[in-house]
Swiss-Prot record:
Substrate binds at residues 8, 40, 74, 88. One of its GO terms (cellular component) is cytoplasm. Its cofactor is Mg(2+). GO terms for molecular function: ATP binding; pantetheine-phosphate adenylyltransferase activity. Pfam families: CTP_transf_like (PF01467). The lineage of its organism: Bacteria, Thermotogati, Deinococcota, Deinococci, Deinococcales. The keyword Nucleotidyltransferase applies. It comes from Deinococcus geothermalis (strain DSM 11300 / CIP 105573 / AG-3a). NCBIfam families: coaD_prev_kdtB, cyt_tran_rel. Belongs to the bacterial CoaD family. InterPro entries: Cyt_trans-like (IPR004821), PPAT (IPR001980), Rossmann-like_a/b/a_fold (IPR014729). Pathway: Cofactor biosynthesis; coenzyme A biosynthesis; CoA from (R)-pantothenate: step 4/5. PANTHER family: PHOSPHOPANTETHEINE ADENYLYLTRANSFERASE (PTHR21342:SF1). This is Phosphopantetheine adenylyltransferase.
Length: 184
């Protein structure tokens, strides 16, 4: 039996990897699907292509896992791929309440079943949002994300830091020039 593990994966975390690894032991094949929502364009740190590349690298050691993307309703993707099971990871009871509503809706409109896998307790606090916040301040995220995500975050924030530094340096030079001009 085959399953789909959907998400935005911006980026994939150790919690995602925990759920995915366990799902790969349960199902013959798992497709990790990056759901692309055009209305959320610009809200992600990583582009769709970057997220796909990070996922491919992070899942390379799992022979029965593939990576894909889709724009639209998940149930439409499931129909197209002829897959009937969605895997969702849960961190806390609050996740369950939301995911249960979505699971019922998916079953009603798409005849798709949802299998919930609880994330290991050590990952219950980890989210992509939290990881990005910590990484943006140079914090250690090595335990919270696979190596591919950590490297991508480091590169992304180094670029942003360099751009910020250049902007501040340019602003400082303009300020010094204006100060010198005002003295004359």
């Amino acid at each position: 039996m085959n399953a789909v593990f959907p998400g935005s994966f911006d980026p994939i975390t150790s919690g995602h990897m925990d759920v995915l690894t366990r799902a790969s032991r349960i199902f013959e094949h798992v497709t990790v699907t990056v759901m692309h929502n055009a209305r959320k364009q610009g809200r992600h740190l990583f582009s769709l292509e970057e997220r796909l590349e990070i996922l491919r690298e992070a899942t390379a050691h799992l022979p029965n896992v593939s990576v894909d993307s889709f724009s639209g309703l998940l149930v439409d993707y499931m129909r197209q791929q002829q897959k009937g099971i969605i895997v969702r990871g849960l961190r806390a009871v609050s996740d369950y309440e939301y995911e249960l509503q979505i699971a019922h809706l998916n079953r009603q409109i798409g005849e798709v079943e949802t299998v919930f896998i609880m994330a290991a307790t050590r990952w219950s606090f980890v989210s992509s949002t939290m990881v990005k916040e910590i990484a943006s301040y140079g914090g250690d995220i090595s335990e919270m994300v696979p190596r591919a995500s950590a490297a991508a975050l480091k590169r992304k924030f180094a670029q942003q830091y360099a751009a910020r530094e250049a902007e501040l340096s340019s602003a400082g030079e303009r300020g010094a020039q204006q100060a010198a001009e005002s003295k004359t």
